[in-house]
């Protein structure tokens, strides 16, 4: 294994917990980049651009592999952000009731030695049950998903909202596609197993 410091360019506790599943040492740094979408920027382009920007903004002096990730939720062709408060969360979930939404998660690994970045993405579909306002309010009051795209925590009670999930890697839904990440790290000579 090459002697790289693994860096997660994120302050998200959810992404940190996901990376901890791999049982490899890493440090977390806060990325410094503008996350404003460009006018008419497609969701896939946005998440890949932001994943690269996050990874390259957290480069450190010693040889490192820096992981950047970004995610958006799309419903009816529109990007849905984090709700940030109770009323917005309720409204988002009401709009999603009975529908399928898609999560696009961009992933980048920046190699500070070669100055090269590999970038990719994964998608995940969430099909919601038909939910009434009372069910949604009870859920929001219990989990307070105010800082989660789509207004739910799939790793918690959010699972109660779903009819089915479609995707290759359930970690993608939480914000870090581990299957793709393992492939990218191995290409850089960083073995997990």
From Swiss-Prot:
GO BP term, pick one: nucleotide metabolic process
Predominant subcellular localization, coarse grouping: cytoplasm
Residues the UniProt record annotates as site (Important for substrate specificity): 14, 71, 155
Protein's organism: Vibrio parahaemolyticus serotype O3:K6 (strain RIMD 2210633)
UniProt keywords, alphabetically: Cytoplasm, Hydrolase, Nucleotide metabolism
Reactions that this protein is recorded to catalyse: N(7)-methyl-GTP + H2O = N(7)-methyl-GMP + diphosphate + H(+)
SUPFAM superfamilies per UniProt: ITPase-like
Family assignment from sequence similarity: Belongs to the Maf family. YceF subfamily.
Cofactor: a divalent metal cation
Compartments where located: Cytoplasm
GO CC terms of this entry: cytoplasm
Annotated function: Nucleoside triphosphate pyrophosphatase that hydrolyzes 7-methyl-GTP (m(7)GTP). May have a dual role in cell division arrest and in preventing the incorporation of modified nucleotides into cellular nucleic acids.
Name of the molecule in the record: 7-methyl-GTP pyrophosphatase
Enzyme Commission number(s): 3.6.1.-
EC class (word): hydrolase
Active site residues according to the UniProt entry: 70 (proton acceptor)
MF GO annotations: nucleoside triphosphate diphosphatase activity
